[in-house]
Amino acid sequence: MAEGEPQVQFKLVLVGDGGTGKTTFVKRHLTGEFEKKYVATLGVEVHPLVFHTNRGAIKYNVWDTAGQEKFGGLRDGYYIQAQCAIIMFDVTSRVTYKNVPNWHRDLVRVCENIPIVLCGNKVDIKDRKVKAKSIVFHRKKNLQYYDISAKSNYNFEKPFLWLARKLIGDPNLEFVAMPALAPPEILMDPSLAAQYEHDLKVASETALPDEDDDL
């Protein structure tokens, strides 16, 4: 193990439809992008993302599919031994949200009882199709949800912090320094961010619809 290498490491699988921004998201973390490794047998890039917490450094080895999800499901080898996961959809594309239950099903079939965060990416785009009130899957399955914008770094650290608290078992765990991130390609409009945060809060306090439908 290299000098100063974090002792605590977790395999994190990043799943969701092609084109939802998974690779853009993981590439924001500059050291992880610099040190990524390609696993040819599975067609996967593994990005080592280190975060410094008040409990020491932790590393997520983030498995990114390199686009093969466009050709159907992923092989079980991708999921095996995953300790946590992020499922991503694109808030400007309803079909990517409709497919979230399929990704969740594939994931929990191989990895039972791992902490999972659902992320709605591209919230910087004004023409949002999947609104806060229609994002209910995470509430039915006890997942955490965050609006994110990979290109503006908006909420980049939130999924990793929530997962770290679950994995370490410390609800008071905090990041003590932010990792070096690629400069924002676009700026998130603060008033839009505030509106979305308000919408999510309202949605979270609204009773779930009764229907048994998965969405």
UniProtKB/Swiss-Prot annotation:
Show the catalytic activity: GTP + H2O = GDP + phosphate + H(+)
Q: Where is this region: Switch-II?
A: 67-83
* EC number(s) stated in the UniProt entry for this protein: 3.6.5.-
User: A single GO molecular function, which one?
Assistant: GTPase activity
Instruction: Give cofactor(s), names only.
Output: Mg(2+)
Q: Which Pfam families match?
A: Ras
* SMART domains named among the record's database cross-references: RAB, RAN, RAS, RHO
Per the database record, which ranges form the Small GTPase Ran-type domain?
6-170
Which locations, inside or outside the cell, does it occupy? Nucleus; Nucleus envelope; Cytoplasm, Cytosol; Cytoplasm
Q: Give the first-level EC class, as a single word.
A: hydrolase
Task: Return the annotated region ranges for Switch-I.
Answer: 36-44
Entry keywords, A to Z: Cytoplasm, GTP-binding, Hydrolase, Magnesium, Metal-binding, Nucleotide-binding, Nucleus, Protein transport, Transport
Q: Name one GO cellular component term.
A: nuclear envelope
Q: Which PROSITE patterns match?
A: RAN
Picking any one GO biological process from the record gives: snRNA import into nucleus
Task: Describe the task this protein carries out.
Answer: GTPase involved in nucleocytoplasmic transport, participating both to the import and the export from the nucleus of proteins and RNAs. Switches between a cytoplasmic GDP- and a nuclear GTP-bound state by nucleotide exchange and GTP hydrolysis. Nuclear import receptors such as importin beta bind their substrates only in the absence of GTP-bound RAN and release them upon direct interaction with GTP-bound RAN, while export receptors behave in the opposite way.
PANTHER family per UniProt: GTP-BINDING NUCLEAR PROTEIN RAN, RAN GTPASE
Assembly: Monomer. Interacts with RANGAP1, which promotes RAN-mediated GTP hydrolysis. Interacts with KPNB1. Interaction with KPNB1 inhibits RANGAP1-mediated stimulation of GTPase activity. Interacts with RCC1 which promotes the exchange of RAN-bound GDP by GTP. Interaction with KPNB1 inhibits RCC1-mediated exchange of RAN-bound GDP by GTP. Interacts (GTP-bound form) with TNPO1; the interaction is direct. Interacts (GTP-bound form) with TNPO3; the interaction is direct. Interacts with KPNB1 and with TNPO1; both inhibit RAN GTPase activity.
What family name appears in the similarity comment? Answer: Belongs to the small GTPase superfamily. Ran family.
**Annotated protein name in UniProt:** GTP-binding nuclear protein Ran
